[in-house]
Amino acid sequence: MTVPAPSQLDLRQEVHDAARRARVAARRLASLPTTVKDRALHAAADELLAHRDQILAANAEDLNAAREADTPAAMLDRLSLNPQRVDGIAAGLRQVAGLRDPVGEVLRGYTLPNGLQLRQQRVPLGVVGMIYEGRPNVTVDAFGLTLKSGNAALLRGSSSAAKSNEALVAVLRTALVGLELPADAVQLLSAADRATVTHLIQARGLVDVVIPRGGAGLIEAVVRDAQVPTIETGVGNCHVYVHQAADLDVAERILLNSKTRRPSVCNAAETLLVDAAIAETALPRLLAALQHAGVTVHLDPDEADLRREYLSLDIAVAVVDGVDAAIAHINEYGTGHTEAIVTTNLDAAQRFTEQIDAAAVMVNASTAFTDGEQFGFGAEIGISTQKLHARGPMGLPELTSTKWIAWGAGHTRPA
């Protein structure tokens, strides 16, 4: 057995100590009234606005370091904060305060023939670990959603956003202390050492679930090495399939919106599939529209292209021989995120929705709609691409588990 170096032992102890503090905080949060949680969210929003200059100064340090490291423009944009973005982050907390509290919701209840009353109701998960890349807004989003759902958050952000995250979490903790709530409801783990991630995802018995949010490499590493339950989020090799019965005006609008609205997010389209029956007329038009929008088109894509999540103004293009071939292609190369078909044929649409294995399937609609707010249930902590415990946009209910409660009157079970 390899004995860890003292520094690693210290780091593991640091993570475990933080998790234990989070468990203590989570026990209190689990029984907080909704009004108190909402008051805390509004207080946190107020603190963010009051300390906006401090937050922006910290973010400027991160941005300067990122520029010196030749960080790509798309990543700089995700890292960047400005007054408007801070205002938006604060507004997001107020929005969460306005959402329905899932804790205590009764999912089902009934009385047994013997008079024993049973009910199943939602309860918090407990301690939620979040591992994410250089997006400071995720720090506050995670805090808001975990607090409202009665959970404590252990956050491990990217080293590229370390200063920003430290400033944000300090402000959030100040808001909690001001209301005599446990500051350890939100804690930021060190991003200076990658081993922090390992210790977090292996803290079985201390951490109830870990949610990785980032690129494919991050998510695969977490799922591979974790000893605590994980919820996979994010990786989106999304397809737009233009069926032979498609309205090409509609197809062009959906394709451009799916690809170009925000190319760096996980619900952006990465592959265009065109039905062979209309390829001769549809392809030139769709390719011209993409190129006019500044999209680099990858014709004759190889295996790597077909599996790539570009997260940029790039798209792979392939021709398929009918709806069954499109379904087979997507189920082979897709990541189970969001898939779209454009067609006026109801049978083809029905076949597509039934046989595509994905968290969301769109019929004559953009892949960009896979989003908690767009789905009508508010903010999300990520988009799950797995089937257990949650699938699709993860809002407040997905940050809960359930418990059964039985009310009796001296009931005993017969031998």
Swiss-Prot record:
Organism this protein belongs to: Mycobacterium tuberculosis (strain ATCC 25618 / H37Rv)
PROSITE patterns membership: PROA (PS01223)
Catalytic activity annotation: L-glutamate 5-semialdehyde + phosphate + NADP(+) = L-glutamyl 5-phosphate + NADPH + H(+)
Main location: cytoplasm
Residue positions where N-acetylthreonine is found in the record: 2
InterPro entries xrefs: Ald_DH/histidinol_DH, Ald_DH_C, Ald_DH_N, Aldehyde_DH_dom, G-glutamylP_reductase_CS, Glu-5-SA_DH, GPR_dom
Encoding gene per record: proA
Function: Catalyzes the NADPH-dependent reduction of L-glutamate 5-phosphate into L-glutamate 5-semialdehyde and phosphate. The product spontaneously undergoes cyclization to form 1-pyrroline-5-carboxylate.
Pathway: Amino-acid biosynthesis; L-proline biosynthesis; L-glutamate 5-semialdehyde from L-glutamate: step 2/2
Family: Belongs to the gamma-glutamyl phosphate reductase family.
Name used for this protein in its record: Gamma-glutamyl phosphate reductase
Pfam families: Aldedh (PF00171)
GO cellular component, one term: plasma membrane
Subcellular location: Cytoplasm
E.C. designation(s): 1.2.1.41
One Gene Ontology MF term: NADP binding
GO biological process, one term: L-proline biosynthetic process
Keyword list, A-Z: Acetylation, Amino-acid biosynthesis, Cytoplasm, NADP, Oxidoreductase, Proline biosynthesis
